[in-house]
């Protein structure tokens, strides 16, 4: 059985847009650069050609990866999950016990995780601890050194 990629509908749409961009924009651009670099002659010492071929390999690999993620995407449906329960696709806000600063993240599938925009993977240590918990629960979150105790204050 193939691995599934749990994700939100938004994440799937983003992957489809990336795939379209890779196939319709990036792939043709790199093919054109390869043609231009070939016209310079001797390919054995042609750094432009080598760079374009490397980029082409990266683009083709990314296309393959994205196609696989789309093919085996599993869209989450939170309709059957309690409103105050942490689950993939939901936003969770928590506060470290004894502190006042709240932190909020959306739990998403690995394919759409981006910590810089507040989206953390459901496979991350913090998400694994939070998933299934409810507002008011106090949990220990593992850190690289030790752990921190947090209270879930909001789920939406």
UniProtKB/Swiss-Prot annotation:
Keyword Lipoprotein: no
Keywords: Coiled coil, DNA-binding, Transcription, Transcription regulation
TM regions (residue ranges): none
InterPro entries, per the entry: GreA/GreB_C_sf (IPR036953), TF_GreA/GreB_CS (IPR018151), Tscrpt_elong_fac_GreA (IPR006359), Tscrpt_elong_fac_GreA/B (IPR028624), Tscrpt_elong_fac_GreA/B_C (IPR001437), Tscrpt_elong_fac_GreA/B_fam (IPR023459), Tscrpt_elong_fac_GreA/B_N (IPR022691), Tscrpt_elong_fac_GreA/B_N_sf (IPR036805)
Coiled coil: 2-27
PROSITE patterns with a match to the protein in the record: GREAB_1
Molecular functions per Gene Ontology: DNA binding; RNA polymerase binding
GO biological process, one term: regulation of DNA-templated transcription elongation
Record's function text: Necessary for efficient RNA polymerase transcription elongation past template-encoded arresting sites. The arresting sites in DNA have the property of trapping a certain fraction of elongating RNA polymerases that pass through, resulting in locked ternary complexes. Cleavage of the nascent transcript by cleavage factors such as GreA or GreB allows the resumption of elongation from the new 3'terminus. GreA releases sequences of 2 to 3 nucleotides.
NCBIfam families (alphabetical): greA (TIGR01462), PRK00226.1-1 (NF001260), PRK00226.1-2 (NF001261), PRK00226.1-4 (NF001263)
Family of the protein in this entry: Belongs to the GreA/GreB family.
Protein name: Transcription elongation factor GreA
Origin species: Lactococcus lactis subsp. cremoris (strain MG1363)
Upper lineage: Bacteria, Bacillati, Bacillota, Bacilli, Lactobacillales
Gene that this polypeptide is encoded by: greA
